């Protein structure tokens, strides 16, 4: 796919990354009816001892994420994508960069509001659906997709997946750790994000994953109850189960009065929080769980349908280190975008390698299918794919895709997915660089806008194409308008030929019969051309005129433009059904009639 955006040199270490698009740059920077606004939140499940000096929000569990995003959801933002900064590898020891995540929230703004229609509110739900081992095996992915589709049939909109790592050290951490609610929510742009102090909203849907099977006391409680059911006993089950109501979990045994806190679940704000254990009776050893995130609309909407697209990717290694990851993204995705598919998320791991020798592997990309309604045409999409190099100084982000998203937001480009990779390089300053694949899409521009943009590029060729039918039309009109004149000229040519023959017979000179035959042939050819060809002001285009004065019926003067070999030439061309066009260089007077005939030629 061609992209009009400028690309930097391949070996330039400072380049932000390659950019691919289905549009040229002027079209990319064309505004549409909507624009977007973004918010960014970095968080981790590591504690201060494990991740010192990081500004990322510390969460005791990924189930606390809805509480952190509560205020942004109240402002109309919804979660668009969530991802780790570095794609986890198969190594047992996880790096801090693999356990730092980013949540990207988006808010849609209409340039011309329609009748005060308010955008639909959403509720964020987090569910644990499987262990990471299931996603490493391609055979298990269809079952995973089926679980997502089952949730979608209940009205949920899939956002993404995120892993949570459990080690023996993490599981034995007591509740004396700083609760997630005590951390102030800090976004990258420091706008409209503040702390929700000690405020935990319960799950609006009253649906909590049954794998954990734990009930959680109030956030400030020092002594937490032990888990009723160990996660270890349900490892790999991969199914979400119904649990008792969140209100019943705050029964007489677990109900505690927290100073400054609110016990009542905040279901009106649309933020859901699942309860998590502060300490487990049976420690977990290096276990990883996959959590799925859904946006649940407050009002019933059409159920989403999802399908997968497999895209081959090429990786190169240096031992166990992955040096590069490449794919023809738009070659495999453009057709789905044009048909109305919307990219949601991508699944791949190094355990899905097809051919270790050539370094090929399949990435599974999840699309939301278009809903074709009655009397409505399918809305296609254009896309941008950015291979972004994100630079981390320790655990702090120095360079990322945030400026790019903010610059494209005013043109209506929506972030759909961020695919992390296991590529990690160290630059000269000692900072880490990792590649992230950023996907954006936008409704296709109207055809008028596309034609307007390309008008200058094709201006000259289009004028030529426009002039051709104009010439044909003009020729047709002139031919029909001069039809009677052509018939009249044909009659005059015949009369002039007879008069000329009479003059030649009386004149002296060699070969009068040959000269007469030449004139007769020329007259017949001219008459045929006048009846067949196109006339401009009484003169046939592309042929020499037999008579310059159509109104001269006396035949006193005749103009001719014969060649010395005109008889043979015209006879051969007439036999082939062609016109006899004589050039100006061949114009000569007729022997024996020089006094009566003046040679002339156009």
Curated annotation (Swiss-Prot):
Lipid attachment, kind N-myristoyl glycine: 2
Biased composition (Basic residues): 468-477
Annotated stretches, region: Disordered: 178-282, 451-495, 524-567
GO cellular component, one term: plasma membrane
Main location: membrane
Membrane topology, from the record: Lipid-anchor
Pfam short name (any one): Raftlin
Keywords in alphabetical order: Cell membrane, Lipoprotein, Membrane, Myristate, Palmitate
Protein name as annotated: Raftlin
Coiled coil: none
Segments of skewed composition (Basic and acidic residues): 197-209, 244-265
Function (record text): May play a pivotal role in the formation and/or maintenance of lipid rafts. May regulate B-cell antigen receptor-mediated signaling.
Similarity remark: Belongs to the raftlin family.
Location(s) in or outside the cell: Cell membrane
Organism phylogeny: Eukaryota, Metazoa, Chordata, Craniata, Vertebrata
InterPro entries: Raftlin (IPR028169)
Bias kind Polar residues: ranges: 178-195
Gene: RFTN1
Covalently lipidated residues, kind S-palmitoyl cysteine: 3
């Amino acid at each position: 796919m061609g992209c009009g955006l400028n690309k930097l040199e391949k070996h330039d270490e400072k380049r932000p990354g390659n950019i691919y698009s289905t549009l040229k740059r002027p079209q990319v920077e064309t505004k549409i009816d909507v624009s977007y606004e973004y918010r960014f939140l970095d968080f981790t499940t590591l504690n201060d001892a494990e991740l010192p000096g990081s500004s990322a929000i510390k969460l005791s569990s990924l189930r606390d994420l809805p509480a952190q995003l509560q205020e942004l959801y109240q402002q109309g933002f919804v979660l668009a994508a969530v991802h780790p900064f570095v794609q986890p590898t198969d190594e047992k020891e996880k790096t801090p960069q693999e356990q730092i995540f980013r949540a990207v929230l988006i808010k849609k703004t209409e340039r011309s509001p329609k009748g005060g229609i308010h955008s639909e509110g959403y509720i964020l739900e987090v569910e644990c659906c499987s262990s990471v081992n299931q996603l490493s095996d391609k055979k298990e992915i269809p079952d995973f997709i089926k679980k997502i589709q089952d949730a979608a049939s209940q009205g949920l909109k899939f956002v993404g997946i995120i892993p949570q790592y459990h080690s023996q050290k993490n599981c034995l951490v007591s509740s004396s750790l700083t609760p997630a609610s005590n951390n102030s929510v800090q976004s990258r742009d420091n706008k409209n994000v503040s702390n929700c102090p000690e405020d935990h909203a319960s799950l609006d849907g009253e649906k909590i994953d049954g794998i954990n099977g734990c009930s959680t006391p109030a956030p400030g409680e020092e002594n937490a109850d032990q888990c009723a059911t160990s996660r270890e006993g349900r490892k790999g089950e991969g199914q979400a189960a119904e649990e008792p109501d969140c209100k019943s979990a705050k029964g007489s045994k677990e109900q505690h009065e927290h100073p400054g806190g609110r016990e009542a679940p905040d279901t009106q704000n649309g933020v859901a929080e699942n309860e998590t254990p502060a300490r487990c009776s049976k420690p977990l050893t290096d276990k990883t769980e996959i959590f799925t995130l859904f946006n649940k609309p407050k009002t019933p909407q059409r159920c989403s349908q999802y399908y997968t697209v497999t895209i081959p990717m090429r990786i190169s290694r240096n031992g166990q280190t992955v040096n590069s990851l490449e794919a023809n993204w738009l070659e495999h995705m453009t057709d789905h975008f044009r048909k109305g598919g919307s990219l949601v998320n991508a699944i791949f791991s190094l355990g899905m390698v097809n051919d270790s020798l050539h370094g090929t592997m399949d990435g599974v990309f999840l699309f939301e299918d278009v809903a074709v309604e009655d009397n409505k045409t399918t809305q296609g999409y254009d896309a941008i794919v950015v291979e972004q190099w994100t630079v981390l100084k320790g655990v702090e982000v120095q360079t990322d895709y945030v400026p790019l998203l903010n610059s494209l937001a005013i043109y209506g480009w929506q972030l759909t997915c961020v695919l992390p990779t296991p590529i990690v390089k160290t630059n000269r300053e000692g900072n880490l660089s990792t590649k992230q694949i950023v996907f954006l899409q936008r409704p296709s521009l109207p055809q008028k806008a596309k034609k307007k943009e390309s008008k200058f590029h094709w201006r000259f060729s289009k004028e030529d194409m426009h002039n051709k039918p104009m010439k044909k039309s003009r020729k047709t009109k002139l031919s029909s308008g001069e039809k009677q004149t052509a018939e009249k000229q044909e009659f005059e040519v015949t009369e002039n030929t007879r008069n000329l023959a009479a003059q030649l017979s009386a004149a002296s000179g060699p070969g009068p019969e040959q000269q007469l035959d030449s004139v007769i042939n020329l007259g017949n050819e001219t008459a045929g051309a006048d009846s067949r060809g196109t006339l401009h002001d009484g003169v046939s285009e592309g042929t020499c005129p037999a008579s310059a004065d159509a109104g001269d019926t006396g035949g006193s003067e005749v103009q001719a433009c014969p060649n010395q070999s005109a008889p043979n030439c015209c006879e051969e061309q007439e036999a082939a059904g062609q016109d006899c066009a004589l050039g100006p260089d061949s114009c000569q007077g007729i022997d024996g009639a020089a006094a009566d005939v003046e040679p002339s030629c156009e």
